Amino acid sequence: MAPSRNGMILKPHFHKDWQRRVATWFNQPARKIRRRKARQARARRIAPRPAAGPIRPIVRCPTVRYHTKVRAGHGFSLEELRVAGIHKKVARTIGISVDPRRRNKSTESLQANVQRLKEYRSKLVLFPRKPSAPKKGDSSAEELKLATQLTGPVMPIRNVFKKEKARVITEEEKNFKAFASLRMARANAHLFGIRAKRAKEAAEQDVEKKK
């Protein structure tokens, strides 16, 4: 293989009958067919449920590098299910993924996922366990006739980018130091508790001196 990008230039010392140990990839086309057949078999097995599996929550990617993007998470938090009015045990039976480890750190994420759950619930076609005796919440016979299996992801998540029109850069924007501002904000957040503790101790010492 030719060197790729800025990696180390290798000096391969071939010993140990290396021709017998060459990694081959001849099973790739057959593996592709096998995966496709497995997907189709799974879709038939879980029909009429969505072929892609249960609905996933909207989550933000971690770290400063990627946190402007959203993607599908593992499962909805217990708080999101509670606000949406869905029991955690019922959720798994109607195609909603649940992750009890997840915590909501912002109101925006909570509201977005609660809205997503409510929208999913309104569009859901629920088949009765016994066709002869449908229960409350099950879909009507007309809806069941029109129901088809969803092949793609359930309510796909899209990153929406708002384009800005070209304009003249202001003097204030030119003088703004973005990196320094971010570092300062991060330092202030890190030192908030320490500074509060120091201020409290200083205030207590002043009270003692006055006595």
From Swiss-Prot:
N6-acetyllysine modification sites? 16, 177
Protein name, as recorded: Large ribosomal subunit protein eL13
Specify the cross-link site (Glycyl lysine isopeptide (Lys-Gly) (interchain with G-Cter in SUMO1)).
Answer: 174
- Assembly and partners? Component of the 60S large ribosomal subunit (LSU).
InterPro entries found in the cross-reference section: Ribosomal_eL13
Q: Which GO terms describe its molecular function?
A: RNA binding; structural constituent of ribosome
- The cross-link Glycyl lysine isopeptide (Lys-Gly) (interchain with G-Cter in SUMO2) sits at 123, 145, 174, 177
The disulfides recorded in the entry are: none
**Which organism's genome codes for this protein?**
Oryctolagus cuniculus (Rabbit)
Where is the protein situated, by its record's location annotation? Cytoplasm
Under Gene3D superfamilies, the record lists: 1.20.5.110
